[in-house]
């Protein structure tokens, strides 16, 4: 038995050697210039669905295979039905792509097609007669070496730091004038140019000048700020834009939070509103990690004044947030008035009565701001003990204010966690649901449907009906599930379309109250290191963005995840009062 098995394995491997993802071929056409379109991906050949298939798409295939163009774009399995997976669907090319893999589509292996919809092409019989020798890849390095030689120059470049020369280089006007990125240098009259640079950016000047020659540059977490600053100062718009696009990628790479704080300060100093907004968003979603980092005591007061009012602050609880502010205040960086201003932004009604009582015993800030704490505690106790209709009638309280609404609380009291089953196969619990019977809980992270179904990450949990102590004995039951396929949506009673998958599904039972509504959130977790995005539950489903920028129709995560997928998802329940009492949850 062994030799035949090895023989077939050898044939399989030999058949795919030298083939790369995105390579294409024509099958069953009876001639070399026509056939069913097949494309290679992850070790196997598959077909393309004819949804949106047109002559532009067909021409990309033909040109990639050496033909001049396509004369027909055929569908409905005109050359017979293929086998294997349907690799691409809803392909939309512009005509300049090297492969269908480079065109817009639903993404790899995302299709509802069957093989009776396989796409085909007929190409012109003429093959391209042009044969090109292209050594242009060597040009970049050759130009870089001209700069490295520092010989044959006609331009002197001085690097000045605070009025003193720090470095000197020579340049070649004929090369620099060919690059608009370098126009700030060659537009200067005469043969001498002075660059005024901050001391921290001096080590990057050489790489910047070499980039003007080679048009290639390597950028890291530690250098991106300086390259952005230099590019902004000297009109290198492409480099400036590229650095700006890297901020979202590089921000999460520093677990110490020194770089995000540094970039925030840089954004404020330069008036870069987009970078400032990006930094604030990252710090808000990852606020718990920030409070545990070494950089926490050095967070500027003005930054905290912007972060603490936000409802998208992700923290275990309001008490945990107050304790973090208490720890921060030990650094004596802020005045008494500034600290009091920060305490004002704490949402005391979101802390339980026993937590409020214990503040006087375990919080160093309490006695130095006793009057404020007593006022805030009284406000919170009224919220916890008096029905909101009476508070609104007799106290004139506006319970739609943020003070009376939860943030993103990640403690088990208000949240639950599931993994992506493709990333982790932990099955510590099991829940079974028959086709006709009710859900029966044995204990669980994963859901086992009948034998023809798959396992899907699943979590059932309970929360209080509302943060007010009036509702502490009233529990709401929730079920959270990761839904990667149309079938999984059907299994759990959700309606999904292929272009929105995967999604998170959330169901609620018990605790119905027309005065309470929910603004629930889903946190996308990357490698257990940072929150990459936060999405809303709309109609009991929360979108899961693409972890990396792809050609799919899905939106990309605010902060890309290098792993290419999220390792887990945390759902946070956020109840609030409907003060007009007319809404439904």
From Swiss-Prot:
Species whose genome carries this gene: Homo sapiens
Start and end residues of each BTB domain: 153-221
Domain BACK: start-end pairs: 260-360
SRCR domain residues: 24-124
Keyword Disulfide bond belongs to the record: yes
Tissue: Ubiquitous. Detected in body fluids such as semen, milk, serum, tears, saliva and urine. Expressed by keratinocytes and fibroblasts.
Gene name in the database record: LGALS3BP
Upper taxonomic lineage: Eukaryota, Metazoa, Chordata, Craniata, Vertebrata
One GO location term (cellular component): extracellular space
Location of this chain's protein in the cell: Secreted; Secreted, Extracellular space, Extracellular matrix
Amino-acid biosynthesis keyword on record: no
Glycosites: 69, 125, 192, 362, 398, 551, 580
Entry-linked InterPro entries: BACK (IPR011705), BTB-POZ/Galectin-3-binding (IPR051481), BTB/POZ_dom (IPR000210), SKP1/BTB/POZ_sf (IPR011333), SRCR (IPR001190), SRCR-like_dom_sf (IPR036772)
Signal peptide annotation: 1-18
Pfam families: BACK, SRCR
GO biological process: cell adhesion; cellular defense response; signal transduction
Molecular functions per Gene Ontology: scavenger receptor activity
Disulfide bond annotation, renumbered to this chain: 49-113, 62-123, 93-103
Protein name as catalogued: Galectin-3-binding protein
Chief localization: secreted
Function field: Promotes integrin-mediated cell adhesion. May stimulate host defense against viruses and tumor cells.
Self-association state and partner proteins as the record states: Homodimers and homomultimers. The multimers form ring-like structures with a diameter of 30-40 nm. Binds LGALS1 and LGALS3. Binds ITGB1, COL4A1, COL5A1, COL6A1, FN1 and NID. Interacts with the gamma-tubulin ring complex (gamma-TuRC), composed of gamma-tubulin, TUBGCP2, TUBGCP3, TUBGCP4, TUBGCP5 and TUBGCP6. The unglycosylated form interacts with PDE4DIP isoform 13/MMG8/SMYLE; this interaction may connect a pericentrosomal complex, made of AKAP9, CDK5RAP2, EB1/MAPRE1 and PDE4DIP, to the gamma-tubulin ring complex (gamma-TuRC) to promote microtubule assembly and acetylation.
Keywords annotated in UniProt: Cell adhesion, Disulfide bond, Extracellular matrix, Glycoprotein, Secreted, Signal
């Amino acid at each position: 038995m062994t030799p035949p098995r090895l023989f077939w394995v050898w044939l399989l491997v030999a058949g795919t050697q030298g083939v790369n993802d995105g390579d294409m071929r024509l099958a069953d056409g009876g001639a070399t210039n026509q056939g069913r379109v097949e494309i290679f991906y992850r070790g196997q050949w598959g077909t393309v669905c004819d949804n949106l298939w047109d002559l532009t798409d067909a021409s990309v295939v033909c040109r990639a295979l050496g033909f001049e163009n396509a004369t027909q774009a055929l569908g409905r399995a005109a050359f017979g039905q293929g086998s294997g997976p349907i690799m691409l669907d809803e392909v939309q090319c512009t005509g300049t792509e090297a492969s269908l893999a480079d065109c817009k589509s639903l993404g790899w292996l995302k299709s509802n097609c069957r093989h009776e919809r396989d796409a085909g092409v007929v190409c012109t019989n003429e093959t391209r007669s042009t044969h090109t020798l292209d050594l242009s890849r060597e040009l970049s390095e050759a130009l870089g070496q001209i700069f490295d030689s520092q010989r044959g120059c006609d331009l002197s470049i001085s690097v000045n730091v605070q009025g003193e020369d720090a470095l000197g280089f020579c340049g070649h006007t004929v090369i620099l004038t060919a690059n608009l990125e370098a126009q700030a240098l060659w537009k200067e009259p005469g043969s001498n140019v002075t660059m005024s640079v901050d001391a921290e950016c001096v080590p990057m000047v050489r790489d910047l000048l070499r980039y003007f020659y080679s048009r290639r540059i390597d950028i890291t977490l530690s250098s991106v700020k300086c390259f952005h600053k230099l590019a902004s100062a000297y009109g290198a718009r492409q480099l400036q834009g590229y650095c700006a696009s890297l901020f979202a990628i590089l921000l999460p790479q520093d677990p110490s939070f020194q770089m995000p704080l540094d970039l925030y300060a840089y954004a404020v100093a330069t008036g870069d509103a987009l970078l400032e907004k990006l930094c604030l968003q990252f710090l808000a979603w990852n606020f718990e990690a920030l409070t545990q980092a070494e950089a926490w005591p050095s967070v500027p007061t003005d930054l905290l004044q912007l972060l603490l009012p936000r409802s998208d602050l992700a923290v275990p609880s309001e008490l945990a947030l107050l304790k973090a502010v208490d720890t921060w205040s030990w650094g004596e960086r802020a005045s008494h008035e500034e600290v009091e201003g920060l305490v004002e932004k704490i949402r005391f009604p979101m802390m339980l009565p026993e937590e409020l009582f214990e503040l006087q015993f375990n919080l160093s800030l309490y006695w130095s701001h006793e009057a404020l704490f007593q006022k805030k505690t009284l406000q919170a106790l009224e919220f916890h003990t008096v029905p909101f209709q009476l508070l609104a009638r007799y106290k004139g309280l506006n319970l739609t204010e943020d003070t009376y609404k939860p943030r993103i609380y990640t403690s088990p009291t208000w949240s639950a966690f599931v993994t992506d089953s493709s990333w982790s196969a932990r099955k510590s619990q099991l829940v079974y649901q028959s086709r006709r019977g009710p859900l029966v809980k044995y204990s669980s992270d994963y859901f086992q449907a009948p034998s023809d179904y798959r396992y899907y990450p699943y979590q059932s949990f309970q929360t209080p009906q509302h943060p007010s102590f009036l509702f502490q004995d009233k529990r709401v039951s929730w079920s959270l599930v990761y839904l990667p396929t149309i079938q999984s949506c059907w299994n759990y009673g959700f309606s999904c379309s292929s272009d929105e998958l995967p999604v998170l599904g959330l169901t609620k039972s018990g605790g119905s109250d027309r005065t309470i509504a929910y603004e629930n959130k889903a946190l996308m977790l990357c490698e257990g290191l940072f929150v990459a995005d936060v999405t809303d539950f709309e109609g009991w489903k929360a979108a899961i963005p693409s972890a990396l920028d792809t050609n799919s129709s899905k939106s990309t995560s605010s902060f890309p995840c290098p792993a290419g997928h999220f390792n887990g998802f945390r759902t946070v329940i956020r109840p609030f009062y409907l003060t007009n009492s007319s809404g439904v949850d």
